[in-house]
Amino acid sequence: MIVRNILSPVSLLILFLLSPVLQQASARDRIPLKKAPATSIFEKKDSWVDETLGRLSVSEKVGQMIVASIDAQYKSNTDKEYVLMSRLATEGKIGGIMFLKGDVVSAGMLANHFQSVSTVPLLVSADMERGLAMRLDGATTFSPAMAIAASGDPTLAASMAKIIADEARAVGIHQNYAPTVDLNINPANPVINTRSFGDRIPLVISMSAAIIEGLQSNGVVATAKHFPGHGDVTVDSHFALPVLEGDRQRLDDYELKPFRAAISQGIMSVMVGHLAVPKLTGTLEPASLSKTIVTDLLRDEFGFKGLIITDALNMKALNDGRSLQDICVKAVEAGNDILLFPVDPEGAHKAVTAAVECGTIPLSRIDDSVRRILQVKRWLGLDRKKLVDLAQLQDHVASQEASEIAEKIAADAVTLIRDRDRVLPFRIPMNGPIVDIILNDKPGEEIGKRFAERLGMDYALIHLRLDPSSKEAVFKSAAEMTRGASAIILTTGIQAFSRSVPSKLSARQINFVRDLPSMVAPGTPIVFVSFGTPYILEAFPEIGTALCAYSENEFSEKSVIQVMKGELVPKGSLPVSLNGGLP
């Protein structure tokens, strides 16, 4: 279950031992959350901001601009990563931390520890597009953006964002690297896809606005990403440099519109992507390192007054012959306020500090960024209360209300792409044999396992998996099983697939799916269910019935089974054009 008792006996013992620290962060000291938009936050004078900025050394100012990453897992006080991060926080060489995978109790403990050793409060962040559980076990899991858009209900998006904010603040996290406002115009996009609200500009703006409001009205900084738009590329920037080919008119008409809307709404942070925009910059320089994109376009022309943050600096899109030191200096020169996730945060700090001290980067450039960072920390109330009360975790994390919202999003998102032969809901004997074929684009025994187990509770079930390494004997066995089946379900969790870029499926897998209708007895129901991208369903028109749930979480799986049994009518609306092209 997603919602569960998150405090084990061991965790409770840890909390008891930490009680002297927790008393400093009691509920009586809860800071009322402000709701001022970015347009006012970053313009007004503030004595705490001025005084803090005035007493920081050059080294400490540069440190404010660096956000280092750490796993949110229990660490002893001799753990190398723990010791390093503690020292960097103590010495003022980092201004924030980004949590990777872990659990809610450990995250809260680590956040409190690093805050306690840092003179200036730390800005703690995480990528929580699908909720806090995307990073931390014990929290509520939500469906991705495309599922939320398919539900067609911005109020659900706002409710989800409010829950994410409440859970995040409970463990000491202040900034969410969401929403993704990229228009997923290209079906072959390998990195955005279901992370996007779709390819329809009004829908993307509406859903993004709900997420921004839900986060920021509940005390968490929202971040629009990946400027100037990562939706029409065919390369994953984690591995290589994508190129956005559009000219300025094209970007104004499409990619830039959701960012303009978010800025007008008062979003507090924008993340710049690692992608080239040659028709704007005249080079293949990544946008995140381009003054033309970061300062001239985003800061000056768009008038954005909030925090500008790089995408993670460990991504291979940046590492084509560039050193980390060069990347960090270039990112600051471009106009970024925060350098996210440098592999060597101390090396990044040293490089930027040296660039300031030798005059390559003006100190005024650093001061501008640090002032904005401190203004955000002031808005968050971190100058008054920077520790969290872990004894209250169960009051805020994985509540019944959160579970109900997550389940409703999943149910409302299920989209019937087509049902040419009207096979849904199933009209077969409950004990009739159903064959569930799990279509993987990589080896693995876990993908689709939980759905098969749950399906087997309602039907007599045979399940098997086909991946690119499957031998011919496996395909022959699968074909034989389908011939006597009462119904066949093809399930997949593939995140990126289109007619033009057929993911990593083998030719044998593709041909098997295409030939499947001719293998079975006439009238045998065949349903293709995607727990990931909807584009794969268009790539196999031979299958007459297709459902998209957009997500592999347990609520989505439950909803699909309810559709098959006639207990749920699928009412989701497809948020993208399956044929691609401009919306």
Predicted regions and their residues:
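Bacterial N-terminal signal peptides
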Residues: V10-P20
